[in-house]
Amino acid sequence: MSGLFETLGRRALFTFDAEQAHGLSITGLKTGIVTCRTPEDPALSVKVAGLKFPNPLGMAAGYDKNAEVPDALLKLGFGFAEVGTLTPRPQSGNPRPRIFRLVDDKAVINRLGFNNEGHEAAFKRLSRRAGKSGIVGVNIGANKDAEDRIADYVAGIRRFYQLARYFTVNISSPNTPGLRNLQAREALHELLSRVLEARDEEGNMCTLKRPVFLKIAPDLTDEELDDIAAEADAQKLDGIIVSNTTLSRSGLKNPENSNETGGLSGAPLFERSTVVLARMRERVGPDMPLIGVGGIDSAETALAKIKAGADLVQLYSGLIYRGPGLPGEILRGLSTAIKYEGVSSIAELRDRDTKEWAARKLIS
């Protein structure tokens, strides 16, 4: 189906503005007209942070911003879906146009700015799926004008605690001024302390401990990675997602739209995000879960992330260019890789190439 989408479906969708096309795809998933058969392979099952994922492939945050179609995404074959980023109050984000396709590079630049309908709208939708199977995580953020941004993250933990299977603390979007400053050691210490305290308080009231992951940028120095790894270990964080979009424009083939401000995602992000993933794996050791994101558009790129150190992987931009058949294609490829490598599970392939990836040089 990926091939058919690339030939016909993408051509039709790409006649629309990028944001309109996104809205149409959400509508398609809501109506149920977009369905794909995907394989179920027990060898793809992965246990991470106390959760059993049917496979390691997830839908990254940013697509289903308002928790409209998480179950439809799971039906495409994703082992988990992440909704958001959600802020306490609704906000419109940055002015349009704010999404730019770089077709020759199979990439996207966005400067959306956490546009979403806020906690209450998403809470109502997620409440309707209470009790359903399937792992749905909630990506939480802060309102642009928040006086205390950390309080916004705490509010997200408390509001969605009963509904989220896990949380992602998003402090790495380049489109909210000053947000990435929360990755600095002192600020990160306060953020994680308050967020994890809220998680523990909520968990103690209902005997459920929800994992909390931290989503970081791919543009960090080795020293900044050192600080994040040390803080994550000290706070007993449940995992790290590597990575968000990049400010780098290295390696782009076509200059059209490349000078637009915002975060770059898609194929050009693969190398940088995978190097940073491997370097983080070297820092945190074998026990902390890592989720690899950035440039995944095939079974080969998904497998490379796993071999570089990822327990789980996520994609978004790849779906834009390859279509709804991509998850199934990736899962079939991973099943084939397990047999080819002569192992019994996908988890056994983790870290095979970590040292090689970590040693690669990054071009800014």
Curated annotation (Swiss-Prot):
Endoplasmic reticulum as UniProt keyword: no
Residues noted as binding FMN in the record, renumbered to the chain: 61-65, 85, 139, 170, 215, 243, 266, 295, 316-317
Binding residue positions for substrate: 65, 110-114, 170, 175, 244-245
Cofactor(s) needed for function: FMN
Any one Gene Ontology BP term: 'de novo' pyrimidine nucleobase biosynthetic process
Family per similarity comment: Belongs to the dihydroorotate dehydrogenase family. Type 2 subfamily.
Assigned GO CC terms: cytoplasm; plasma membrane
Protein name per UniProt: Dihydroorotate dehydrogenase (quinone)
Pfam families, sorted: DHO_dh
Lineage: Bacteria, Pseudomonadati, Pseudomonadota, Alphaproteobacteria, Hyphomicrobiales
Origin superkingdom: Bacteria
NCBIfam families associated with the record: PRK05286.1-2 (NF003645), PRK05286.2-5 (NF003652), pyrD_sub2 (TIGR01036)
Functional description taken from the UniProt entry: Catalyzes the conversion of dihydroorotate to orotate with quinone as electron acceptor.
Keyword Flavoprotein: yes
Active-site residues, as the UniProt record annotates them: 173
Native source organism of the sequence: Brucella melitensis biotype 2 (strain ATCC 23457)
Pathway the protein acts in: Pyrimidine metabolism; UMP biosynthesis via de novo pathway; orotate from (S)-dihydroorotate (quinone route): step 1/1
Catalytic activity, as annotated: (S)-dihydroorotate + a quinone = orotate + a quinol
Membrane topology type: Peripheral membrane protein
EC number of the protein: 1.3.5.2
